[in-house]
Amino acid sequence: MSGVILDLQLACENEQGLPAETDFQRWLEAVLPQFQPESEVTIRLVDEAESRELNHTYRSKDKPTNVLSFPFEAPPGIELPLLGDLIICRQVVEQEAVEQGKTREAHWAHMVIHGSLHLLGYDHIEDDEAEEMESLETEIMLALGYPDPYISEKE
């Protein structure tokens, strides 16, 4: 058993059709143990209003977004397995899946993997960083049996 602890918070008005908690756990366990074997992550599933508010407050972007990552930084000298929080907007993820021709499950998995890598310190601001992060995401997605999430961008 992995040392990955998931705290799943459902803050969506409509919870029907969401991935199961076991799916979120499986996606986290595909990423985290190789980097931080003992880790705790909160995943909060939200509606557009909460996503928009958080995106505006923390990124100065007045629109909802697919996933926001909030890494936890323990005070010096204190070691905790708490990695951070992922805030995922249901409507944005599901709309993107349709627009990008992906299954909802694959896109949900990708958003959890993408957000988890952000919690671990990966970023995609610079081209070389983006290439490294996207390569890791693709490797993890393929290992889980999902298609390359960037295939349409590579064609």
UniProtKB/Swiss-Prot annotation:
EC number: 3.1.-.-
InterPro entries: MetalPrtase_cat_dom_sf_prd, YbeY, YbeY_CS
Keyword tags: Cytoplasm, Endonuclease, Hydrolase, Metal-binding, Nuclease, Ribosome biogenesis, rRNA processing, Zinc
Subcellular location: Cytoplasm
Keyword Hydrolase: yes
Leader sequence residues: none
GO cellular component: cytoplasm
Predominant localisation class: cytoplasm
Cofactor note: Binds 1 zinc ion.
Necessary cofactors: Zn(2+)
Molecular function as annotated in GO: metalloendopeptidase activity; RNA endonuclease activity; zinc ion binding
GO biological process: rRNA processing
Residues reported in the UniProt entry to bind Zn(2+): 114, 118, 124
UniProt enzyme class: hydrolase
Annotated family: Belongs to the endoribonuclease YbeY family.
PANTHER family found in the cross-reference section: ENDORIBONUCLEASE YBEY, CHLOROPLASTIC (PTHR46986:SF1)
Function field: Single strand-specific metallo-endoribonuclease involved in late-stage 70S ribosome quality control and in maturation of the 3' terminus of the 16S rRNA.
Protein name, per record: Endoribonuclease YbeY
Species annotation: Erwinia tasmaniensis (strain DSM 17950 / CFBP 7177 / CIP 109463 / NCPPB 4357 / Et1/99)
Gene: ybeY
